[in-house]
Design a protein with these regions (language model features):
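Detector for a conserved hydrophobic position within an alpha-helical segment of the HATPase_c
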Residues: 133-134
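Conserved micro-motifs of the catalytic ATP-binding
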Residues: 9-12, 51-54, 117
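A conserved beta-strand-to-alpha-helix junction within the catalytic ATP-binding
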Residues: 13-27, 86
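Short conserved segment of the HATPase_c
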Residues: 102-114, 169
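Conserved catalytic submotifs in the C-terminal HATPase_c
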Residues: 35, 40-50
Length: 178
């Protein structure tokens, strides 16, 4: 049931949410795996609190998949950094690990359904991440070097697509009256 819910697209329930709350709750869900490998999760938040217009449950699913991949990739007694911040147009979150990394020839395929390099798993985790982030008007970037680690960056618009459209229409209306 949880598996089918994860792969079947649902309409996001958009609300203004604190991105850090979503990430911290996801980290708590992964606590057993983190403790089993003695991994230190280090949160690095920017000065301003990043808010996202999004569906908290869907975003938790995205971070659950990304953080799970990082946990799988790193050796015992290592660290995973989760960095959040805001730039001019976007709220971003990065999950940084120094694990096994992704081979250069595999990088173009990570969002494809059923693509996996793991012995276990279904190869749909990053496909789901990509879909969720895209449904939120954002994008996912992956920077990885084999045997050196991976940085997964999620970027979300600071304003929802609907809000940007309204603002754009208001600006056009102002230009027409002058």
């Amino acid at each position: 049931s949880h598996f089918l819910k994860a792969i079947r697209p649902t309409t996001p329930d958009f609300k203004k949410i604190k991105l850090l709350d979503v990430i911290e709750e996801t980290v708590r869900l992964k606590e057993r795996e983190v403790n089993a490998k003695n991994i230190n999760i280090r949160m690095e938040a920017g000065v301003r609190e990043p808010f996202v217009n999004g569906d908290a449950e869907q975003l938790k699913q995205a971070f659950f998949n990304i953080i799970g991949n990082a946990i799988d990739a790193v050796p015992e007694n290592s660290e995973i950094r989760i960095i959040t911040g805001i730039d001019s147009d976007h709220v971003f979150a990065q999950v940084v690990d120094q694990g096994t990394g992704i081979r250069k020839e595999d990088l173009p395929h990570v969002f494809e359904p059923y693509f996996t390099t793991k012995k276990e798993g279904h190869g749909i985790g990053m496909m789901i991440v990509h879909r969720i982030v895209r449904d939120h008007g954002g994008d996912v970037g992956i920077d990885s070097k084999q045997d050196a680690g991976t940085i997964v960056t999620l970027r979300f618009p600071r304003k929802s697509p609907r809000h940007r459209l309204l603002e754009s229409n208001e600006l056009q209306g102002e230009n027409q009256t002058k």
